[in-house]
Amino acid sequence: METNILMESGTNELEVLEFTVGNNHYGINVAKIKEIVPFHVVTPVPNSHPNVEGIFMPRDMMITVVDLAKVINAKPSPDIKKDMFIITNFNQLNVAFHVHTVIGIHRVSWADIIKPDSTVNAENDGVSTGVIKLEDKLVIILDFE
């Protein structure tokens, strides 16, 4: 498998899934992704965090859905039926991130990731771990952990 080489020490590369929320491009390390599924109607959870859209149960597994547009203060999707859920697993917890489009996967060198400074990303509460320049656009790498 091609992805396994990225786990070996010394490759100095990672694969990043590019997606959009609003008009901006974002990325997440592919190693953190469990699967990508089309938008599902979710069940709201009373008294949950405002960024939690609700829950859904594909294949009898309950997954919390986080509305990434709310998290990053972006506009809602213009066509929710075309949206996607990026399902991740962090600390044995399955979480789906509601995004507007999924663009594709890019293999990048760690050296190509530009670290954000403190004016862009507060050290303790920022979700951006870096920025990658791809062709004519900037892709902001998000860390959901």
Language-model region placement:
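An acidic, low-aromatic, low-complexity terminal/linker signal
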Residues: M1-E145
